[in-house]
Amino acid sequence: MIRMKHVLFTLSTLLLAPPVSVSAADLPSTLMDPYLRIHVSLADDKMDGVVVSAKAMSDVAQKLGPQAQPVSQSATKLATAKDLKAARTAFGELSDAMVAYAKATGATFGRDINVAVCPMVQKPWLQKGTTITNPYFGKSMLTCGEIKKG
């Protein structure tokens, strides 16, 4: 009888426990991987994977709490983009939200991630490495921009 109570207690504890949320340590893989896929696609003048990656980012950001809501909202908007122009505009909002989220939470994105800025649109983006690949103008102005901080 004691064992049965122990089993029932253990099961009820597991079932009633709050869902596990994504922690700051998970940010590089859960937010940065889809973000970087979007960046690469837009820099290459393509929409390949943009919608799927934006939806994934929105889902992850929803689990991170109120500070990540701008990331979730921006990613959701990007997921509805119908063309490159709309996607690039939404990506600018998403990039602003990502930078703000990192500042607000003290998160570091690691993995050689740098903040770059396009002087033409005055918008940042996060990218791997220091070789500029501008997602706002793609191949027509691929190297336009500068690294702001590493």
Protein language model features and the residues they cover:
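Bacterial N-terminal signal peptides that target proteins for export
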Residues: 1-14
